């Protein structure tokens, strides 16, 4: 496979263009650099930038059927062999504070043993771990190691997010035991996050498993073993997601039951109050008709005696309800 000149890969508005030094570090790509399997290049682009979009559409380094995928046409995780290279689409957790975490970020990449082209629109936070290792000189030394480290970082972020959702579910379950109902929409958002994670992480696990089984020339046996470990780890995360989805369904039923019981208690309380005051309401209405005058209206103790009779009547009804075990 022929070497590539640095001038063929340098894009003015690239997020970064680096040359791996083969010792775990990187250096900025220059026009006179030679890109080969010993010193591969990593070109990271935002496909919405004008120069990046033009380079993706015109460079002879990419197969024609790869251009649209790198320009944002591909969304679901998948892996495809394209001659000597491989096209991979991955999803990662969006941890930005101004965006909802259930909106996963897509990262698309095409790579062979000489160079890596990765594209995105929103920032891929998981890449910061790989970038930090490369800048410190402890990163991958070749394309196979780079792919394994990226997949490992994506899985770490996914696992952390799954743990956060699991902790929220535990807190909800504890609150429900104390008859505390979560705010409206909270459980629905939590369930949506779990479903979105399940939708994209399941095919991503299959991508990792296929990469572990494919005999790609730029991946060693150690790389394939590590990739299989990553696939197994993400599979355990998917099992946790399935369990969490089932628990949210149980919690939804429990919340509905708690609210129904609360409504029943309030209705029962109002019914008892109506039973207690119904006799007194009847007598006050009867005495207030005024068709033949108010009985006892001319006696100065008439009103006091009537109030005492009402208190006795209410007390008697309350005592009867208590003995009947309605109170």
From Swiss-Prot:
Periplasmic topological segments: 295-300
Topological domains annotated Cytoplasmic: 1-273, 322-327
Upper lineage: Bacteria, Pseudomonadati, Pseudomonadota, Gammaproteobacteria, Enterobacterales
Transmembrane segments: 274-294, 301-321
InterPro entries listed in its UniProt record: CorA_cytoplasmic_dom, CorA_TM1_TM2, MgTranspt_CorA/ZnTranspt_ZntB, Zn_transp_ZntB
Catalytic activity: Zn(2+)(out) + H(+)(out) = Zn(2+)(in) + H(+)(in)
Main subcellular location: membrane
Cellular component GO terms, alphabetical: plasma membrane
GO molecular function: cobalt ion binding; cobalt ion transmembrane transporter activity; magnesium ion binding; magnesium ion transmembrane transporter activity; zinc ion transmembrane transporter activity
Membrane topology: Multi-pass membrane protein
Localization annotation: Cell inner membrane
Any Pfam family: CorA
Source superkingdom: Bacteria
Organism name: Salmonella typhi
Protein name: Zinc transport protein ZntB
UniProt similarity note: Belongs to the CorA metal ion transporter (MIT) (TC 1.A.35) family.
Keywords (A to Z) from UniProt: Cell inner membrane, Cell membrane, Ion transport, Membrane, Transmembrane, Transmembrane helix, Transport, Zinc
Function: Zinc transporter. Acts as a Zn(2+):proton symporter, which likely mediates zinc ion uptake.
